[in-house]
Amino acid sequence: MTASTATALTHVRVFDGERLREPETVVIDGPLIGTDPAGARVVDCQGATLLPGLIDAHVHVRDAATLDRLADHGVTTALDMGGWPPALLDSLRDLPGTTALLRAGGPAAAPGSVQSRMPHFPESSLLAGPEDAPAFVAERAEQGVDYVKIIAEVPGAPGALSQETLEAVVRAARERGLRTVAHASAAAAFAAARRAGVDAVTHVPLDAQLPATEAELTAAESRFAIPTLATMEAVAQALGHLGLDYTHARASVAALHRAGVPILTGTDANNAPGAPASVPHGPSLHHELALLVDAGLTPLDALRAATVLPARHFGLTDRGAVAPGLRADLVLVDGDPLADITATARVRAVWCGGVERAGL
């Protein structure tokens, strides 16, 4: 990485988070996007497109090297959706010149759940009933989490949180001003999470397509979705013999999009031992964008799903767009991703908080 100095990117097309602008000059002035090119190092970006730094709204990160891999692929902000211990996640926050990490800490899960058998899973994350929700949320708030993760499974299934417990976690989080994100990879679990009032559901069903009525309710109740199609595709390939079908996930995204539910990019990238599918950090975000377009989003929709929408829905007011005064999280790609979404993977340069990644 090189030290932050003023840089003027000239003749560059700019996707500002909402639209593609004609070639112009964008100034990187320290950690922010500036306006004055005087004295700046000039980089001619003819033929390239400048994007806001990409946001992966569902990852699992265990070390700084993983953040660097994300950054090298243009992912400048990542949202960890379940990690522990707190000291590890704290050590990965606010590292200069690499991907910025937000985190949920340990998710709320039921005794007997798959999560309960994970190594060193936090005891405080195991909720026997709604009476355990306030203490769980209080502990996460004390740890400084950015949002609360909840595991929603098919109601009544072994190892599933009850509907009352889901609702109690949402209430307790809302009282503390924390957003809630529910894991739900089955159609009935998705509906249970939506009824509980979560802000977002991550994953889409592999067991059945979401009905249009469920998608419409999700939109009417102002929920948003993080489908993680890259992971759903990989899981279906690994466990298709169990009746899991990627076409259900793809059709569910199409239904949510038609209903007007905001769609955010998230990959569930992880390298955890024993995971049903290993999804690589960085490249999977570009694959996710292509899968979203395949599911019916336009390239413009997909780019917004990776930039302005996650910034908006997670309250990240300093990023997600290209405008003076915002954080200089930027990615320069060859080509025009509005014409060909796969252009996002042709990364020429990346800036994280104004610090340029070297060696790309």
Question: What residue ranges belong to the model's regions?
Answer:
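C-terminal cap of metal-dependent C-N hydrolases
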Residues: V12, P324-L360
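Divalent-metal coordination cores built from histidine and acidic residues
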Residues: D68-L178, E221-A234
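His/Asp/Glu-enriched, well-ordered alpha-helical/loop segment
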Residues: R250-V333
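Active-site core of metal-dependent hydrolases
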Residues: A157-A251, N271-P273, D294-G296
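Histidine-rich, glycine-flanked metal-binding segment
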Residues: M1-T7, R13-L51
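Divalent metal-coordination and catalytic microenvironments
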Residues: V12, P31, G47, H58, ...
